[in-house]
Amino acid sequence: VITLLVVAKVKKIPAPVLLDLAGMGVIIGQCIGRWGNFMNREAHGAVTEAFLKMGLQDAAGVVTYYHPTFLYESVWNLIGFIGLHLFSKKRKFDGEVFLLYVAWYGLGRAWIEGLRTDSLYLFSTGIRVSQLVAIVSFLAAAGILAWVLLKKKPAPDALYVNRKPAEPEAADGKDTDD
């Protein structure tokens, strides 16, 4: 986050513009990264006999089937990435794509975390820390989205991409910023 703010300041680009780009990269990174949980045989859900299940063999050769939460989250994030990509050209304000990412990820993470067996709990309560953070993230992002769209009513010409004129390319074809 600090690097993003420094880059925004140095390049004179509004931070929400960079957050929109970061959100797209992070969600596809999470989609791919969850497969590391599969390779490590970790972060799976509870024992299940559901249609989608992942078999893990213990040292004695006994196979137990678990919810493949890595797969659920990977598919959830892939759907989110596709949705954000399609939506990104229709956004009404800078930062909207990032807020949608946070809301989407929070919603999915709250659901998927409920299936996992290796969760960290808040003190001695039955509240999972990741679920709490996910729900708060979803509510905050959805609240900010609603507030901006209903109260501020942003216009498409307010988007940074629509305000900044295209920079001319140098005669040799190289970027003029170098």
Predicted regions and their residues:
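A feature for loop-to-transmembrane-helix boundaries and adjacent hydrophobic helices
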Residues: 1-178
